[in-house]
């Protein structure tokens, strides 16, 4: 991977400057943007296999609803016809996606080399959302090499053990099986206050990063796959780290996080170029972009960014501002506003839709 372009400098691209110029002028119409011939015209937005409609379902099999007026007289009550192919409630459609069987455990990598772009928040809230629906089998791992805060913001502080302690005992834990494996691994995990997901906290000592070599990272991920169905990984900021690169190479789903700021979105775009050049075109094409609103009033730039990232990734989801997240302290999913929960439910469903059976 060292020769695959990881250390390429982030030179501004014409398509990016065109995008920002239009946003600054207030012309936030993605269809009018010049995307540069290198990428062609914007692709159609991703449409999941289970459409998340806002309108209730109407019967589509030719059967009249049970109360509908008959041609010769008033409505007659007959046997209720149940339509089970799609639920009427769009929230229930998304819940069904998250409840589906997952044939093999999936690793979701949350990435953007820029700091302060809500990687940790997105990792935690995705784990919390999926875990609240599935009830078990979801974990958030803070794989940030430089004093990540996921372990502080999520999970109960029932102990101070981190990834460092797990790696010190990794051989012993790997050799466990069945319930013994779950019990043994649990000694190194923290838990959400509502029990919806587990947390593997990162290590605060920066010297420990040297011990997270690619082989060790793969062993940890394989261990977590034995005990969990969904592994959400906060990847940190260092794209040159073998640790970061290994997680991206191993991931099933890339989640690009950003906020509506030029520097944050440009860095995300540069990262996608980097991954393309490193041979991860399929991971990039299947990626989901999360745009988080850090203030109550969305800026015009967010529409332009959404239009741009639709040309680069499978889907774009915008999640709203929520005052419960503003303090930067503990992330408590139950405290979020209903609209915020719905947005994260949709985001999680879009991420998991390709893998649900």
Outline where the language-model segments fall:
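Beta-strand-loop-alpha "switch" segments that mediate conformational coupling across diverse proteins
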Residues: 292-338, 344
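Acidic-aromatic/histidine active-site loop/patch
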Residues: 1-107, 175, 279, 287, ...
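Conserved catalytic-core segment of NTP-binding enzymes
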Residues: 220, 230, 235-313
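Walker A/P-loop NTP-binding active-site region of P-loop NTPases
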Residues: 109-179
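Cytosolic-facing regulatory segments adjacent to core modules
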Residues: 181-193, 201-235
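Extended, charge-rich low-complexity interaction segments
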Residues: 323, 345-357
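Short, hinge-like loop/turn segments at secondary-structure boundaries
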Residues: 155-159, 274-275, 306, 334-336
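Conserved nucleotide-binding/hydrolysis micro-motifs of P-loop NTPases
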Residues: 144-147, 204-206, 237, 261-262, ...
